Amino acid sequence: MRFVNTCAQKQAFGLVLLSPFTIFAPDFRGKFMKNKLLYTFLFTLLVVAGLFAMHFLPSVSFRGEPLRRVDLLSDIRIKKEIAEPMDSDTLVLPPPVKPAFVDTCKSGMVCIEEYADSAGRGMEYFYEALGKVSSLDRPVRIAYFGDSFIEADILTGDLREMLQKRFGGCGVGYVPITTKIAGFRPTVHHSFGGWSSHSITDSTYFDRFRQDISNHYFIPSSGAYVSLKGEKRFLSHIDTCEVSTCYFLTSDSLRLAASVNGGEAQPFSVGGKEELQSVSVNGRIGSVRWKVEQLDSTALFYAVTMDPRQGVVVDNFSTRGSSGQQLGNIPMSILRQYNRLRTYDLIVLQYGLNVASDEVMNYTYYKDAMKPIVERLKTAFPEASVLIVGVGDRENKDENGELRTMPGVKRLIRYQQALAAETGVAFWNMFEAMGGEGSMVEMVNHKPQMANYDYTHINFRGGKHIAGLLFETLMYGKEQYEKRKAYEME
C-alpha cells in the first residue's frame, strides 16, 4: 500500500511539474516564432538597405580594372547614355577633317580618306603601280607596319592572298632571320640556327643604329642558317615563289650558300661594303635554305624573302606592344637603302592598341610624336603612298560590369585622322569599317568566333574579315582614281 501511495505521489508530482509547461507551451512557442520572423525581417531589411547604400559608394578599381558597382535594380533600370569622360588636360578635340577631294563612296563601305599634299602623297602612287603591275620589272610591294593586331600574319596574310589573286604574285615576302612566333605563323615554315638575335623589344641592350626596317638585327656564327618553306594548307599563292633574297650588311668579305628545294647549294662570295647588300636565287622555289659558309668579321643579317618577279607582295612588320614610335629610331640611311633595294609602293601604319586607354582623352602628344615619323618615311620612300589605318574597336568593362567600347578609342581615331591630314597622307577608319561601337563584342560572339576574349585582338577568321573590307575599299579607291584621272584628261 505504501508502495502504491509512493507511486501515486510521484505520478501526482509529475503531473504538477508537467502541467505548467503543458498549459503554457503553445503561448511560449508562438512568441518565439513571432520574434524569429521579426528578427529575420529586420535582418533582411538591413541587408537590402546596405546593398542599396553600396550603390552610391565611389567606384573602386583593382589592378586597373573597375569592380562592378552593386545595383539591385540593374535588370529593370532604364539605361542612360553615359557621356565620355573629359580629363582636365583636354582642350578642344580636333574637328573631323574634310578630305581635299571627296569621291563618291558606296553605301555601307568605309572609304579611304585622301589628304594628299601638294606633292600628291595620298594613294596615287599605289594605284598607279597597280595599274602598271604587268609591265613593272619588279613586284608591287606593300610594307604593312603594326602591333600585335597583325602578329603572325593575321589580316596581312589574307590581304596578300586577295591582292595576289587579283594582280598576280606569290610568296610571303620579307621574313626576319629569326622569330619567337615561328610556330604560330601559319603562312610559312620557318627554321633557323646559329644566330644571336636582337630586337627592339629586347629587355637587354639593343643598338638602334644597327637595326633594319623591321627593328631587328642578327649576328651569325659560322654555319648559321635560315630556312623557309612555302605553305599550301592555309592560303593560296604562298606554297611556292620565284625569287628568294637575303639582306645583310658586312664591311668585310663573306661566303653564303643557298639551296633551293633541297638541291645543290649555290655559292655566293660577297665583298665588304658600308651599305645594305642583297643576293638572290631564282626559280620555282618551294623551299630555300640560306647558310653562312664563312665570315671574316662580324656581319649583320636582316631577312630572307619569298617573292614573285611580278604581281603583288605584302611584307608583315608587326611589333608586339608597339605604338609605332619605334620606327623613328631606324637610321635614315638604312631606310633609304631599303628604298633602293626593296622599293615600296604603299606603306601602311596601323597602330593604337597600345595607345588608347580609359584615362587619356587628349592624344595630342601621340599625334605630335608620330608626325616626324610619317615625314621620315615619306622622305625615305619618296614614291610610296602612305596609309594610316585607325585603331579598331577595343572593349572593356565599365563599373557596372558591362562591356563597352573603351572611351579613348574614338578619341584616338580623331587624332589619327588629324595626323593623316597634317602630314598629307591617306586615312582609313577601321573602327567604323568593323561596325563601330560594340563591333568587337559581335566578332567575339560570332559563330565561328572571329576575335579573342580579351575583346582587343582578332583571330585569323577576324583577320580575313577585316582584310576583305580593306581590300574592297582599296579596289574601289583605285577604280575612283582611274575614273577621276580619265575625267581630268578629257
Residue ranges, per PLM feature:
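Alpha-helical scaffolding within the catalytic cores
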Residues: S118-G131, L327-N339, D368-R376, S439
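Active-site segments of SGNH/GDSL-like serine hydrolases
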Residues: G64-L67, V348-N354, R376-I413, N429
